[in-house]
Every structure is written in structure tokens, then in C-alpha cells.
Regions:
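Short secondary-structure junction/hinge motifs that connect adjacent elements
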Residues: 33-39, 53-78
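Short secondary-structure capping/turn segments at boundaries of alpha-helices and beta-strands
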Residues: 40-42, 84-85
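Active-site phosphate/ATP/adenylate-binding loop shared across adenylate-forming ligases
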Residues: 3-26, 59, 69-215
Length: 215
């Protein structure tokens, strides 16, 4: 019987294999290997997340019937509001935060990630950010239209953008959302200074933050 615990060889090897795949960068088009990894991840989730397994069985998508990653059932967003969906005990979570509650503010979904998942997400996000946001510069001043993780430890975008700030930002990079709201003074001062010096800055954040400022 296969051991799917967090410390098992199966999980450690799967994390290592996915990380190796990510490190092959965006020009890697090994569809066969991608499918193998996706099926292994599905196997892990199928055997360790009871609500997900029940959902798959009801949809006629038992593990034995899945051959390609396209056949793997996607989890409805409502499931994160009703269940704790993790492949590991939540006390071993490295990150824990809530979804935005867009569909129902009174019932926010909860997401937990172990250290292996955090490492994989950081590697993938770093690769995409370098490719599509900072392809021609190592670091840049970044103004973040979000609260910091210290101010909002349960918000996923705050956690993710802190990684962007530390990996791609200069020391002058800053968060614009404070306990008092949007720091308009810092925002405008930074824009004027950037124009005067001819130095670009990156404005990154949620759409809502920009809407509030433009209004």
C-alpha cells in the first residue's frame, strides 16, 4: 500500500520532479512528462482528500478511469468554502489564508499549503514574473497596491506579492495600502519622482486598488 503522507518518498519525489520540470523553464514543451506529473498529483489528492475523492467518484472520474490531465476533475470554488482540502494535516501548513469571498463575503474559502507547495509556487511564479513582468531588468522599484503580509497575513495576494517585492524589487519598493487606507501621498510622490528621474517603476496589485485610486 502506497504511503501518501507528507514525509513519504512518494510526496518528496513528486515535489522534486515537479520542481525539476519548472526549472526547465517556459520553452519546455514535454507534454508527456507534464501528463505524468499531473496524474501523480491527482493520485495523491484522490487518496488523501476524502471530499475530493467522493466528488470524483460521483462524476465517474475514479482514479482508474483517468488517463490524461484533461480528464482530472477541477474543484468547484464552493468546495473551498465547505471543506478543508489538503493532502496533509493542516497543522503542518506553511501558509494559511482565505479567499476573497467574491461570491459570498460571509463564507470565504480557506487554503493551506505545505512547505513543498510553497516552494513550487514560488519557483513557478518567479519564472513567470521574470518572463512577463521584468524580462529586461534584474530589479525595479515596485509600488504594491495591497497591504503587507504583516498587516494582512490571511490574504494570498499579500503573501505572493511580498515574494515579488523581495525577489525583484529595490529597497525603495513599498506597500501603498496601510491601516489608514491608500497612501496617496507616497503614491503621487513616487510617480512624480519617477517621471523626473526618467526611471520606471512597477505598479502591482489587485484591480480593486487601482479602481479606488482612479475614482
Amino acid at each position: 500500500m502506497t504511503d501518501y503522507s507528507l514525509e513519504s518518498n512518494f510526496v518528496k519525489q513528486l515535489d522534486s520532479d515537479i520542481l525539476d520540470f519548472i526549472k526547465q523553464r517556459l520553452d519546455n514543451h514535454n507534454d508527456k512528462r507534464f501528463n505524468e506529473l499531473a496524474l501523480s498529483e491527482f493520485e495523491l489528492q484522490y487518496h488523501t482528500i476524502k471530499p475530493y475523492k467522493e466528488y470524483c467518484v460521483k462524476k465517474g472520474a475514479a482514479l482508474s478511469k483517468i488517463d490524461t490531465w484533461e480528464q482530472i476533475p477541477a474543484v468547484p470554488s464552493l468546495a473551498f468554502k465547505k471543506f478543508i482540502l489538503t493532502t496533509f494535516p493542516i497543522e503542518k501548513a506553511e501558509h494559511a489564508y482565505f479567499t476573497s469571498g467574491t461570491t459570498d463575503p460571509s463564507r470565504k474559502g480557506s487554503i493551506y499549503r505545505d512547505k513543498g507547495a510553497v516552494d513550487l509556487i514560488n519557483a513557478a511564479n518567479g519564472l513567470l514574473t521574470r518572463k512577463y513582468v521584468f524580462p529586461d531588468v534584474d530589479r525595479m522599484k515596485i509600488l504594491l497596491m495591497t497591504p503587507s503580509p504583516k498587516m494582512a497575513p490571511g490574504i494570498g495576494i499579500a503573501i505572493g506579492l511580498e515574494r515579488v517585492r523581495t525577489e525583484f524589487g529595490t529597497p525603495e519598493s513599498a506597500y501603498l495600502i496601510t491601516p489608514l487606507g491608500l497612501n496617496v501621498e507616497l503614491f503621487l510622490k513616487s510617480l512624480i519622482e519617477s517621471e523626473r528621474l526618467g526611471e520606471p517603476i512597477a505598479l502591482i496589485g489587485s484591480t480593486t486598488g487601482f479602481i479606488y485610486f482612479l475614482k
